[in-house]
């Protein structure tokens, strides 16, 4: 890809739109699956939990989340109208039954009351938050006492080598994330560092180091 194409690819990752956005969302279902599973493991979901996800994309992973326990309820937030529509279409039966609920938001203030959710998950979205510290405070606000949040993200040392992250991305490392969560009043439960094989757009397999940080509200 030339520079212009790389920049556009990065913008699509931040805010998928149009046919290209739908294609990228399908790709992310595959490339994000390991991180999504690891973050879900860190949540320790139990029966009856109410879940919130920030940046769900087309939400092709919803069945995996809902299979973790019984009587779960899922809420998804997206800044991308196309992803909101695609996730709603793809999971129409669960929307109709009230198990899944999808919403658009502007990317900063979460449109929910205090202490609404038992578990919060977000995968590869933190780079696009306008103010990561403020968002961590928002996540803490909507989390129930005893609730758990899990954030999964590529480590800065790896992400900075990817040419499409030069624009639209604010790269982070796990120590920064730990600090933001602690300043939001949360207690760190786990900081997990992992490496997985992922396929690039050219088909090459590369090692991707990533982190999962989980925290609870006492």
PLM region spans:
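A short glycine-rich, Lys/Arg-flanked "PGG" loop and its adjoining helix->strand segment in the class I
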Residues: 133-145
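N-terminal, positively charged/glycine-rich alpha-helical extensions of SAM-dependent methyltransferases
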Residues: 1-20, 30
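A short SAM/SAH-binding and catalytic strip from SAM-dependent methyltransferases
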Residues: 119-132
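Conserved alpha-helix/loop element of class I SAM-dependent methyltransferases that forms part
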Residues: 30-49
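Conserved class I S-adenosyl-L-methionine
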Residues: 148-178
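A short acidic, Gly/Pro-enriched loop at the edge of an enzyme's catalytic core
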Residues: 108-119
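Class I SAM-dependent methyltransferase SAM/SAH-binding core
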Residues: 50-109
């Amino acid at each position: 890809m030339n520079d212009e194409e790389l920049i556009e690819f990065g913008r699509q990752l931040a805010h998928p739109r149009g046919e290209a956005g739908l294609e990228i969302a399908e790709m992310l279902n595959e490339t994000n699956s390991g991180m999504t599973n690891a973050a879900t493991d860190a949540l320790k979901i139990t029966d009856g939990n109410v879940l919130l996800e920030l940046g769900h994309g087309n939400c092709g992973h919803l069945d995996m989340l809902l299979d973790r326990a019984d009587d779960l309820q899922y809420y998804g937030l997206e800044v991308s109208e196309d992803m909101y529509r695609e996730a709603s279409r793809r999971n129409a039966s669960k929307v109709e039954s009230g198990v899944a609920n999808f919403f658009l938001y502007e990317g900063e203030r979460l449109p929910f009351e205090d202490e609404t959710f038992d578990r919060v998950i977000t995968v590869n979205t933190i780079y696009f938050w306008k103010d990561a510290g403020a968002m961590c405070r928002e996540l803490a606000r909507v989390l129930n006492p005893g609730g758990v949040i899990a954030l999964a993200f590529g480590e800065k040392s790896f992400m900075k080598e990817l040419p499409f992250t030069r624009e639209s991305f604010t790269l982070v490392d796990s120590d920064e994330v730990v600090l933001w969560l602690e300043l939001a009043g949360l207690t760190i439960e786990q900081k997990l560092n992992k490496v997985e094989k992922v396929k690039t757009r050219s088909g090459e397999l590369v090692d991707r180091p990533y982190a999962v940080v989980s925290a609870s509200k006492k």
